[in-house]
Amino acid sequence: MVENAALTEMPSDELLEQCIDRYLEEHWEDIVADIDKLVRIPSFEDLGEAAEGAPYGPGPRKALDIALSMASDMGFEAHDDAGHVGYADLAGASEEQLGIIGHIDVVPAGPGWHFEPYQVTRKDGYLLGRGVIDDKGPSVVALHAMNLWHRMQLDGQAPQLPYTLRFIFGVNEETRMDDVHYYRAHHADPAFLFTPDAEFPVCYGEKGIYHSLMTSADVPVEQRSVLSFEGGTAVNAVPGHAQAVVRAGECEFPAAQGIEVELLDEHDAAAALEAAGAQADAVGRRLARITATGRSAHASLPQGGVSAIGMLIGYLLENGLVGEGERAYFQTVARIAAATDGSTVDLACSDADFGELTIVAGRAAMQGGSFTQTIDVRYPTTITGDEVHAKLEALAKAAGGTCEKTRDDAPFLLDPQGPAIQALLASYNQATGEDAKPFTMGGGTYAREFSRAASFGPEKPWEQAPEWVGGMHGPDEGVGEQLLKEAFRIYALTIGKLMQLDL
């Protein structure tokens, strides 16, 4: 507890608003340049290239170096925890902390981009590039909001803050969040923390998150019609792309929306058979490469996506391109991909706080002679992760395969009427003139990993963006510059309001 934190003489709202306006006017181009520095780093996890000081691969390591350099240049005390995580402090009157955590790792770019994914493109008031909204752009904006308070102190417009303000740079959010597990094993939790990695106005709870890997029986290549099958880029995204190489037989390949078929010439067919481990001379060579193009979407909001894996499997099944040894497995995956609410696999349920369960078949691959499929389920309080797993495990076994649970995080809720949530909400409403209410979501952010935390903006999904602006985890990821400017204002106001609470 910080004594007299509520009595600390803070700047008036009028002065703070003036300082915010001036900072945006003088430093907006600096903010965009800092976002671009991070977007230029393809900072997705690559464990095959992990090394000492770079436990998640070279991309996250390089992004962390850049972020810590930014913080150091602003005058903060920057620290690197062996590449697992980094943090920067604005020292307060107490060692007790208020925290902000953003992540600077990303999912891979994937196909389908019309803009360069690893640099910021500015077009008609929007920034485009991998990470501009998830979560490099918001992280840079929040770091600059922290810098605003530092500059106000240097200019004699703000006192030393009652809490130490800590910005934590995460680099493993998109996969296992091992970065925050490492951080919490070595540091105490802040008294309260928010993460700019969700939507406004403020999220006070997150659904449970279940991940698993479904694996088919090992079918000898000579008995398979499907020689290869792959799709998606991440477990936590509706797959926007999928591709298979199949024995074509006498199939005439009827036209279908989103499906492209390429008959392989003799050379490519022989190469495909060799890659699959088949004897080219012993098997007919009429092969086809079939590609499905759907629409990617984050697994927390899958309703707007179209599963390319589901499209591709449906086409294969409808046209007799699946062998008997593979049929049960592909039929099972097709059921999972057929509906995002779990109704096709008897998992549909909901509750008052979280709404309905969602399910996504995210990434498909080959493992030896087996097919594999990741599954992402976001579940409310009316079902448990164990119950979800039991249902999916039974489906896998019935198809002759297995289902291995790889993650299960229970739902979490904060009191929406508590002082911290209300402070965040008040900052949002002050900046926007709205009378918004807190909400819950299916997304999984760092907030669930800490003892007292909330996810807080900056997305506003009810605002329409041009059709060429994509969402997080999809191609042409984009964000409006005005939205980020508004987020800067909200975060700057929030720091002031939280500092006046007895947490």
Q: Which residues make up each language-model segment?
A:
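A short beta-alpha structural unit
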Residues: 52, 331-338, 360-365, 376-381, ...
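Short glycine/serine- and small hydrophobic-enriched flexible loop segments
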Residues: 144-151, 313-320, 493-496
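Acidic-enriched catalytic cores of C-N bond-cleaving enzymes acting on peptides and small amides
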Residues: 204-230, 235-295, 299-362, 383-400
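Short, hydrophobic beta-strand segments
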Residues: 244, 288-294, 371-377, 405-407
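N-terminal helical capping/dimerization or prosegment-like subdomains
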Residues: 2-99, 106-109, 374, 483-486
